[in-house]
Every structure is written in C-alpha cells, then in structure tokens.
From Swiss-Prot:
PANTHER family: FLIPPASE KINASE 1-RELATED
Similarity comment text for this entry: Belongs to the protein kinase superfamily. AGC Ser/Thr protein kinase family.
Lineage: Eukaryota, Viridiplantae, Streptophyta, Embryophyta, Tracheophyta
Region (Activation loop): 720-774
Domain notes: The activation loop within the kinase domain is the target of phosphorylation. The PAS (PER-ARNT-SIM) domains are required for the binding of FMN chromophores.
Residue stretches making up the Protein kinase domain: 577-864
Encoding gene (name): PHOT2
Record-listed Phosphoserine modification sites: S9, S22, S121, S364
Application of this enzyme or protein: The flavoproteins improved LOV (iLOVs) are fluorescent flavoproteins engineered from PHOT2 by improving its photostability and brighteness, and which maybe used as oxygen-independent fluorescent reporters with a small size. The iLOVs are PHOT2 fragments (385-496) and contain many amino-acid substitutions relative to cv. Columbia, to confer different properties in term of stablity, brightness and color.
Manner of cofactor binding, per the entry note: Binds 2 FMN per subunit.
Biological process according to GO: chloroplast relocation; circadian rhythm; phototropism; protein autophosphorylation; response to blue light; stomatal movement
Inhibition and activation profile: Autophosphorylation is inhibited by staurosporine, but not by tyrphostin 9, sphingosine, GW5074 and BML-265.
Binding site for FMN 1: N169, R171, Q174, R187, N202, N212, Q233, K238
The name this protein goes by in its record: Phototropin-2
Length: 915
C-alpha cells in the first residue's frame, strides 16, 4: 500500500513547494508524469576586453570579474538593497533556491505498484533536492542496480524523462564510441563495491555525444554491505581535451600542455563528497536548507555565517573537546579520522577579543566525515591556467605549429571546445572576410620568429564574425632557441570605426599594450612548467644528480653513512635501502621508513610514481621539491641525503623524524589542544623555518600540522615542498632612524634584517582550510600567504580546529573570504594570543602581520615575549599532557622487500576513499 504524501506545512510553503518540485522516481510503473519547468544559466562569454588598469594576471578589473571568479567556487554576487557600493555574496545553492525554485525541474512518477522498487524516504528526497549536482542513486541490493532517484540536472543533461529511466541501469547512456575498457572498469567497481572516477563518451536521448566525467561511489550500511550507488555526472565536453589525451609527441609525452582530466577529477571528488554526506546526514541537510537564507557580506560586522543561531549550554560546549581523532601508531594521516569537529561552535564577532559567546552552528554536521579528505593538499590550477585572457600557445617544433594550450576565455570567445582546438593550427578562425594580406604578415612573422600585432576579422564556431586584435609573440628557452608561440586575441568589435572599418588608432594603441602585457604574463607563467618537448629521461634528470653535504650537517652520522657509499664510487640507489614500514602518503607520493643496509641508519624516503605525476600535471612540482630540499641547511628543515630514480619512481632520501607529525601529537592530547606555552614554542620554530625559506626566495604554501614533523628531541622539521614556489629574494638591512640628541640613550636600536620573496604567483594550491583569501580570488599571492597559514596553525593548536572550516570546499572558501574570525569562549586563550591570530588572519595581504617586515614583525609580537630567538634550538619543549610518542623500528617485524606487493605502491589515479 502506498504511503500517503505528507501535507505541506503551513509554516513553510516554500519548503513544501521545493518538495513537490524535487525529482522523485520511486514508483516506476506509473504512466502519469508531471513535467516542471527547467532553466539553465550559462556564464557569459569573455571577450577579453578589460578596461581600466590591469593587474599582473588581469583578473578582477571590476565587480563582474569578481562575480565570475567567485562563481566558480559556488558563490553568487548579490547587489545590496541600499546605496552600499559593496557586493554581497551567498552560496549559489541559496541564490538559486531563493530566486527561482522552479530551476529544480520537477518530474514525478506515481504508481499503485509500490513494491516494484525500494522506496526512498521523504526525508532523503527533500535533502537530495537541495543539491545542485547532477547525479542518480541506484539500488545496489537489486540486480543490475536500478535507478531509484535522479536529480533534475540529470534529465536536463540527458534529455530523458523519469518514465524512460526509472528502474533501468545507467548503461542506456552508452553508444557506439563509448570506451569498452572504461565500461569494464565501472562494472568491476560496482561488482566489488568500489569507487570509480573517469571520463567516457556518452549519448543523450537525441543521439548527441558528450563527454561525461562519471564518479561512482558506494553507500554502505553498518555491516559494510553496499546498499546504494551514487553516480554523479559532469558534462565536460567544453573543457576536456577529449581524444587528444591520447595524442603523443615523438618523445612520448602528451601534446597537450595541461592534462585536464586530473583537474576535473579533483573537483568531481570534492563535489560528490557533499552528495554522500547529504545521504548520510539528511536530517541536518534538510534543517540547514530551511534556515539557510542569511547572506554573507564581505567585511561585515554583522553575523556572516548562514544558519540559525541557538545558544548552547556549558555542557554542549564541553562536548566540543571530546576526544575523537584516531591515528595510526606511526602518526600517519592515511586513515585518521576526527570526531572533535562534529559540534563546531560559532561565536559572535568580537572586535576587542575580550569575551566570546558560544552559539550553535548548523553547517558542521558532516565535518568529521570530511576530516581525512580535506587535509590533503590541493593543486587545482597553475598560474598559466588562471590567466583570464583569450590566448593560445602553439609549438612550432611540431608539424603545422599546432595549438597545445587554449585558455578558457579563448574557448568562450570562439565557441569551440578544447577538444576541437588542441592539435590544430589557428587558421580555423579565418573566414570569407578575413584579409589574406594580414594573414600573410602573420605567416612571415612565424617564419622569421618575431612578434607582430595585427587586426583582422575572425569567425566563431557559429559563424559570428569579430574584429580580432591579434598579438603573436615567440617564446625562447634559456639557450635562446624557439620554444613556443603565444597568440593573444582581443575582441575589438565594439570599438570599430564605421568609416574606416577597423579599430581606431587610439583603441589599437591601448589594446596593443594590453595584449602585449598578457603575452608577457603568459611567457612568465608557462616557464613554471617543464618544456613539453623534453625527453622523459631529461625530465627526471635532476633526481639522478649526486647530492653533497652542506656545512651545518655534514658531520652527522646520517651523512657519514652516505659518504661511505659515495667514497666507494657507487651511486646511491634504491638497492642500498631496506624498507621498514610505511610512514604515510601525501598529495604526490608515499613516504617510507628505510634503513641504509649495513649501517643501522634510518631515513625517510619519499617515492613518487612518474606516470601519475605526468597525468596529474605534477612533474614540475616534483622537480621543484627536489631543487628546494637540496638548498636547505637548517635545523628546522629537512636535509637531502640522496635522490635517485627507478624505471617507475623518483625518490628522495631525507631525515627520519621519529616524533611523527604535529597533527598526531595534537590528536593524542586529552583536549585535542596545546597549552599556550607549547603552541608558542612550536609556532616560534615555524617562524624561524619560514624566515629561512623566505630568505632563499621560497614560499612554502602548505603549512599545516601534518607537514610539521617532530624530531626525537621534540624540535620541529618542516616537510613537503611539492606545492612550494621558488623565486628571487633581495635581502634588506633596515637601519632605524637615529634618535634625537635629547632622547639619545646608551643602547642604540639594532638594524633589522628583512628578506621576503619578491615575485608573485597565482597557482591555486594549498590545503583547503589553510588557503589564504588571495589564492581563492586569484589576485596573485606573495609570501604573505605563509603568515596567514601561521595564523590558522596557531588557531588549530590552541582551539583544536581551524576557524573557517565548512561542510564542503565551497563553504570553506566562502568562510575564508567573508566569515568573521571568532574564538570559542570555552577555551581560555590570552588576549595577546588572540591578537596575534587576528593580525595574521588579516584578509588584506598588504596589511597582514609579516607582509612588510617579514618574520621580524612576528617575532616582536607580545605573544612571543620570553622566546630567546637565537638560542631556541637549545630550549627544551614545554611539557605535554600526552608526551611525544617515538616511532621505532620493530626488531620482530618481518623482513620485506621492494619487490613485494604493496610495498612501493603504484598509485596511477586519483583515489576515492569516502568511507
């Protein structure tokens, strides 16, 4: 018997309307359907014609650019009602629900045969209807895993109706050119209850093929049995390289400068996490959707976080500190989980930081489930990919000078997909009215390897013509040989002089400066990447270079053991080391505890799989890390003892830190926090480590407890430099002004040494909770992002959590940009401690503590009073509630070899581990 539909609540007609319009496919035998209205929004094409002054990457010239960039991370701009000139932001999902609830197209199917397929509860239906993702839910307990729920986006994307898909397996999307190997992978994952993420060619109802980035993940019950599968689809036809991902150069590397599948997979994995958590915590999601109507306004003094506020009792505040982290004995972050975030406490803003109030926060229902996922470093875009201008890069060393990179803005301007552009020559933009004499000038410039700026008529894919101010610029390598051509386009259609039928001289002059500046920025950005024409053996050549000791550590027992091998004429390699145990894994590889055979000396070995590094655009990251570590000679930074490569991996041999990670140390504390004395000690050593890095021109970019290792004596070592940025640094000695004669004292103020990296970067890298605002907005960042991360680190050490964490990446980024900084009143922290955090977490990087005077500004803060900076190496770490746990070699452990299964893990793809 069919369960009657609950009547709409008189208290919330909007919620009732949302429930009726949400897509429901639970009674598949119905012959009656109700089709709701559908609408879709598309991003307006970028013409690249920005006005006004231009920043280095020419992003955010006006509010439209801000809106466009923030929209990529789930935020929508809202014009204020009053005369305020600012822009308010709220999550896109909230804007969509409040502006037009019919956007969630409705299709219902009812039937008297209620037992045909398992029902999904009304509560779950309501929760799922709040999501913006395109996905289906299948019943894993039934043969062929029939679909029992689909989001409205699935119908919009595929063109099918509920009657046509309910009860069916998703294979109806397959067609003649669907890769059978990918289909076999999906079947194997479904059969074994595993996850899958991959791109395959699917077909819409009308036969139109499209590239579908499919992510499948299981939902399991308490006994570990798979009961549902979520299949999330993302149409990536516009931006994927498509079949070009298999196009190779003569050197065996991809013709495309960037491998886009890896980018899209990382975003998809974060997106499906929200779907999974919605199913697992549907009650909280429904409650949040009802109360989530408060807008977030930048720099607002009012409550910034969406959600209903309810005061909590003291007992509730105590539950915040309930132990919940679980770590492996080695301190590895592989399988750690954290329940201490389940009841995050939200405080009202407090400008003077003298008192706080504890207020409940609704968006924290799934934070513990995301703990292990979001602590990994992310690498979402290089500086090159974030230049929002119309440009392409071609390689004249290949036949016909094909395009190997096309910006997203270029795709919008020309209406072509990336798959249609890569591998082609730019002449596809020509048409009937294209002046061939101008085209010949471009050909002559290519032949002569010189730059040229011209204007000509080009055509979009749909046949629309536009006036293109085109700038061609050659790019040469360090030897002066031609490497690439950079082609920048600017749509000048709105500035054509009718009588002359061309751009005016003034417009051409101004626009020429703009396209030339863009080409210069592209030239700088592309140099961060390895030369696409490099032979694979040359790409990893740096890892085969010998390593020699630097002055301060050359007499250590670790170096003496390595030097014995070098003295014998041998090259240090994998065969010299015996695997002991795995220590953990990061974004680019796995870390092993190893022993140098015959010496008893222990080291840490980081192994990175070559194919995975290439597929995920991380080859240059591995090379940068090797270069950086080879320069380090400091007690709070790792020492490189050797680097080498095998046929499949590149390896780095560095210090083994038996104290494990600071993350694990925090985890073991009864309250999951450190005392101020301990936090001060560790923060001080981090400051000194960062000061040394900045002096070398290195921006760390991934400071977090997982990357702070502890030596046996309790002192720190900063680890993992694969996300770091290396540039130049010009040290300065600032002489203080001499005091007046009247006030002259015996002690003269000492000069201040300041050394901060001088160049900006615009890569989108870091760890979600620690990323600085300027990285999210794409405004370009300097070493000031490390001081922001120091503020987050201090907050986590003192309060047991980070201040801006949200239930998903979009919400975390929204919080980082707009949420007021508050402090839990249930945990006493001194005023100077809160003041230091507040000045470090200044959203304006130019006003952030440390941005002008570097580490010296931070050292002088009152929080660090009592720290003897020159002698901090000799200090004993303050006592801890739970002492340091030392990782030791187990004498009874079974001997293992590198050839054994699972010892040197070959991770060739992105992993999904949501459960």
């Amino acid at each position: 018997m069919e369960r009657p539909r609950a009547p709409p609540s008189p208290l919330n007609d909007a919620e009732s309307l949302s429930e009726r319009r949400s897509l429901e496919i639970f009674n598949p035998s119905s012959g009656k359907e109700t089709h709701g209205s559908t609408s879709s929004s598309s991003k307006p094409p970028l013409d690249g014609n920005n006005k006004g002054s231009s920043s280095k990457w020419m992003e955010f010239q006006d509010s439209a650019k801000i809106t466009e960039r923030t929209a990529e991370w789930g935020l929508s701009a809202v014009k204020p009602d009053s005369g305020d000139d600012g822009i308010s932001f709220k999550l896109s999902s909230e804007v969509e629900r409040s502006k037009n609830m019919s956007r969630r197209s409705s299709e219902e199917s009812t039937s008297s045969e209620s037992g045909a397929f398992p029902r999904v509860s009304q509560e779950l239906k309501t929760a799922l209807s709040t999501l913006q993702q395109t996905f289906v839910v299948s019943d894993a307990t039934q043969p062929h895993c029939p679909i029992v729920y689909a989001s409205s986006g699935f119908f919009t994307m595929t063109g099918y109706s509920s009657k046509e898909i309910v009860g069916r397996n998703c294979r109806f999307l397959q067609g003649p050119d669907t890769d059978k190997n990918e289909v076999a992978k999906i079947r194997d994952c479904v059969k074994n209850g595993k996850s899958y993420c991959g791109r395959l060619l699917n077909y819409k109802k009308d036969g139109t093929p499209f590239w579908n980035l499919l992510t499948v993940t299981p939902i399991k019950d308490d006994q570990g049995n798979t009961i549902k599968f979520i299949g999330m689809q993302v149409e990536v036809s516009k931006y994927t390289e498509g079949v070009n991902d298999k196009a190779l150069r003569p050197n065996g590397l991809s013709k495309s400068l960037i491998r886009y599948d890896a980018r899209q997979k990382e975003k998809a994995l974060d997106s499906i996490t929200e779907v999974v958590q919605t199913i697992r915590h549907r009650k909280s999601q429904v409650q949040e959707s009802v109360s989530n109507d408060t807008m977030v306004k930048p720099d607002s003094s009012t409550t910034p976080t969406p959600g209903r506020q309810t005061r909590q009792s003291d007992e509730a505040s105590k539950s915040f500190r309930t132990p919940g982290r679980v770590s492996t004995p080695t301190g590895s972050k592989l399988k750690s989980s954290n329940n201490r975030h389940e009841d995050l406490l939200r405080m009202e803003p407090e400008e003077l930081m003298l008192s706080t109030e504890v207020i409940g926060q609704r968006d924290s229902w799934d934070l513990s489930d995301r703990e292990r996922d979001i602590r990994q470093g992310i690498d979402l875009a290089t500086t090159l990919e974030r230049i929002e201008k119309n440009f392409v890069i071609s390689d004249p060393r290949l036949p016909d000078n094909p395009i190997i990179f096309a910006s997203d803005s270029f795709l919008e301007l020309t209406e072509y997909s990336r798959e249609e552009i890569l591998g082609r020559n730019c002449r596809f933009l020509q048409g009937p009215e294209t002046d061939q004499a101008t085209v010949q000038k471009i050909r002559d410039a290519i032949r002569d390897q010189r730059e040229i700026t011209v204007q000509l008529i080009n055509y979009t894919k749909s046949g629309k013509k536009f006036w293109n101010l085109f700038h061609l610029q050659p790019m040469r390598d360090q030897k002066g040989e031609l490497q690439y051509f950079i082609g920048v386009q600017l749509d000048g259609s709105d500035h054509v002089e009718p009588l002359q039928n061309r751009l005016s001289e003034r417009t051409e002059m101004q626009s020429s400066k703009l396209v030339k500046a863009t080409a210069t920025n592209v030239d700088e950005a592309v140099r961060e990447l390895p030369d696409a024409n490099t032979r694979p053996e040359d790409l990893w050549a740096a890892h085969s270079k010998p390593v020699y000791p630097l002055p301060h550590n050359k007499e250590s027992t670790s170096w003496k053991a390595i030097k014995k091998i070098q003295a014998s004429g041998e090259t240090v390699g994998l065969h010299h080391f015996k695997p002991i145990k795995p220590l953990g894994s990061g974004d680019t590889g796995s870390v092993h505890l190893v022993e140098l055979k015959g010496t008893g000396e222990l080291y840490a070995m980081k192994a990175m799989e070559k194919t995975m590094m290439l597929n995920r655009n991380k080859a240059h990251r591995a090379c940068i890390e090797r270069e950086i570590i080879s320069l380090l000679d400091h007690p709070f930074l790792p020492t490189l003892y050797a680097s080498f490569q095998t046929s499949t991996h590149v390896c780095l041999i560095t210090d083994f830190c038996p104290g494990g990670e600071l993350f694990a140390l925090l985890d073991r504390q009864p309250m999951k926090i450190l005392t101020e004395d301990s936090a001060r000690f560790y923060a001080a050593e981090v400051v000194i480590g960062l000061e040394y890095l900045h002096c070398l021109g290195i921006v760390y970019r991934d400071l977090k407890p997982e990357n702070i290792l502890l030596k046996k004596d309790g002192h720190i070592v900063l680890a993992d430099f694969d996300l770091s940025f290396m540039t130049t640094c010009t040290p300065q000695l600032i002489i203080p002004a001499a005091p007046s004669k009247r006030r002259r004292s015996k002690s003269q103020p000492l000069p201040t040494f300041v050394a901060e990296p001088s160049t900006q970067s615009n890569s989108f890298v870091g760890t979600e909770e620690y990323i600085a605002p300027e990285i999210i907005t794409g405004a370009g960042h300097t070493s000031a992002i490390d001081w922001w991360a120091l503020g987050i680190l201090l907050y986590e050490m003192l309060y047991g959590r980070t201040p801006f964490r949200g239930k998903n990446r979009q919400k975390t980024f929204a919080n980082i940009l707009h949420k007021d900084l508050t402090f839990p009143s249930s945990i006493p922290v001194s005023l100077v401690g809160r003041q230091l955090i507040n000045t470090l977490l200044n959203r304006d990087p130019s006003s952030r503590l440390g941005s002008k005077g570097g580490a010296n500004e931070i050292k002088q803060h009152a929080f660090f009073r009592g720290i003897n900076w020159p002698l901090i190496r000799g200090m004993s770490p303050p006592p801890l509630d739970a002492p340091l746990s030392i990782i030791e070699k187990d004498p009874n452990a079974k001997d293992i070899k590198w050839e054994d299964d699972g010892v040197l893990v070959n991770s060739t793809d992105l992993d999904i581990d949501l459960f």
